[in-house]
Amino acid sequence: MRLILLGAPGAGKGTQANFIKEKFGIPQISTGDMLRAAVKAGTPLGVEAKGYMDAGKLVPDALIIGLVKERLKESDCANGYLFDGFPRTIAQADAMKEAGVAIDYVLEIDVPFSEIIERMSGRRTHPASGRTYHVKFNPPKVEGHDDVTGEPLIQRDDDKEETVKKRLEVYEAQTKPLITYYGDWAQRGEENGLKAPQYRKISGLGSVEEIRERAFGALK
């Protein structure tokens, strides 16, 4: 099972990624984790990546793909792997294809932006404990205060409506085109000797369990 998970920030990809990893016994491939590990280990690619990072520059796609190919050779990838948050752009998707990185499924978790804004902007956090609430879906007993300590709750900057909207705008511009990219490739079939992935789209609305069953059903 080799798959890419697509969906907007706040669509619930992280939660479903954990279920999928557990069910199929596959690792989640995080480019951030790979970069940090390569830099720490001092591999040739890691040293090169560190140069860009220290200069405050983005690590080039070609270097990231090199790290991906190294990572996929490790034994825990024998049964497959799951990409969440990569590729983010058409250029990265093209680079993966050219590098011969095989993908069986592209699974999109679809949630309307209005729902995502409500989900994320309604979150409230108790800073000391990390306890989280939601003004609509999981409200505290006393509005604006932690159930255990009674201390005030905060809204993290990441959860503020204007921040959420900006993240969704970036997704719309950069990552959403991947949905068309993989959908079109699935229709065209094999390219460059690489089998086209099957493209599946599920609704990300409903309970966590309902979405999990939809995801498992789509990956049969």
Swiss-Prot record:
Ligand binding (ATP): 10-15, 123, 132-133, 206
Biological processes per GO annotation: AMP salvage
EC code: 2.7.4.3
Annotated localization: Cytoplasm
Region named NMP: 30-59
Pfam families: ADK (PF00406), ADK_lid (PF05191)
Domain of life: Bacteria
Chief location: cytoplasm
Single GO term (MF): adenylate kinase activity
Domain notes from UniProt: Consists of three domains, a large central CORE domain and two small peripheral domains, NMPbind and LID, which undergo movements during catalysis. The LID domain closes over the site of phosphoryl transfer upon ATP binding. Assembling and dissambling the active center during each catalytic cycle provides an effective means to prevent ATP hydrolysis.
Family statement: Belongs to the adenylate kinase family.
Subunit-structure text: Monomer.
Protein name: Adenylate kinase
Organism encoding this protein: Burkholderia lata (strain ATCC 17760 / DSM 23089 / LMG 22485 / NCIMB 9086 / R18194 / 383)
